[in-house]
Amino acid sequence: MSQSAQHHAINYIEFTTTDIAGTRAFYEKAFSWNFQDYGPEYIAFNKDQAGIDGGFRKGGPQQSQSDAAPLIVLYSQDLKATQDAIIAVGGSIVVPTFDFPGGKRFHFSDGQGNVLAVWSE
């Protein structure tokens, strides 16, 4: 994920796929995208080719459209302050902060049916 990210801006998009190898092959052949591997369950693409940094994570078959929805990821300079602001206006943390290669992130619900994530170094 980009180190020069703007605070609270959309910075990353994450999709779910049941077939990492097939997804990689499709986007490499269709759009000439290159990928970075993060193990057998995650591949990432970059904004130089795709217009935004993002990735595909391995997941099970989607049961509904909301299960298949991409995950929009915002950047924060201060995860704790951002969590506090979300909770203060009625949002909820649905996935607690966890480490991933490149930083930490959490997922939140805005109370209107949308789930987004926030990350930081």
Which residues does each PLM region occupy?
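Generic structural signal for beta-strand residues in well-ordered domains
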Residues: 3-6, 28, 49, 65, ...
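N-terminal first-folded block
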Residues: 9-45
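Conserved short beta-strand elements that form part of the metal-binding/catalytic scaffold
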Residues: 33-67, 115-120
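Vicinal oxygen chelate
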Residues: 1-6, 10-18, 36, 62-121
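N-terminal beta-strand motif that seeds the catalytic metal site of vicinal oxygen chelate
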Residues: 1-24, 51-52, 70-72
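Conserved active-site tyrosine of GNAT-family acetyltransferases
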Residues: 23-27, 86, 113
